[in-house]
């Protein structure tokens, strides 16, 4: 299948990592953006009020500063303090919108200690705005643990919706969007990775996967081995930025494209459902138990994992499958 490559050369790029501006004529400068948001009506009916003792999950741009909502700006301005995955990166965002609220660090490596400190401040009546580097806190980013702590203490949590790379990619993918599963980043540990790839090979729903440029080629090759070269995939790169690119192809085409070019930027992969994949496990009734187990072993599962998978497919216990194998 030939690749359908769609490049967006008119997306306004205001990359926060590049001082929140660009020299391109289509970019949104921090100054112009500040002028725009100063005129935004953030509501006076009380629905947008920032309340004490509340955690706010503030969605931030995934590449284009203009995607930051007026409600998000209001919360960042009025919260007592801001918890940030990376205080330097969030600091650049805050500078662009003229916000000078105090910040504290909350990330994957300090979330236990920092989380308890944030909880104490929330219980004392302060309001906190949680920001990650990009997108919605808790979605493949720090935040879920803090929300769980709040839930356990009866602390209100409010999400301020906004940009999300997974949903943005899904929307432009051309795949079935009625049912989908978010995988995030695939495991790096070999056994877990092979098990996840085997699951994807029989997944009927559209699957959304995050990948970094230095692992993209390996992941595409492994997906092709697991799902078959004819399985459709949409690759989304640099979403919402000036060099946004959407490639609609199949896994054979994707591997071919990236054999001739080096990946650049962060990727969202949208893998189409199991009806496009090389083998349908719904055909198990036509094969023997041994053949069924061999299928999963060929997909990278260990003997025991394969037996568990076959037992699940056939609705019987692992013991029955094991006895059938040793007959």
Task: Give residue spans per PLM region.
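Glycine-centered tight-turn and secondary-structure capping sites
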Residues: 142-146, 303
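Short beta-strand scaffold positions
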Residues: 84-85, 141, 210
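Glycine-rich, highly charged phosphate/nucleotide-binding loops
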Residues: 110-118
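Class I SAM-dependent methyltransferase SAM-binding "motif I" and its flanking Rossmann-like core
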Residues: 145-203
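A contiguous loop/helix-start segment that scaffolds small-molecule binding in enzyme catalytic cores
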Residues: 2-4, 8, 33, 52, ...
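Glycine-rich, flexible N-terminal cofactor/catalytic loop recognition
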Residues: 2-9, 31-109
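Loop/turn-to-beta-strand initiation segments
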Residues: 54-55, 126-128, 206
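Short active-site oxyanion
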Residues: 76-82, 154-158, 206-207
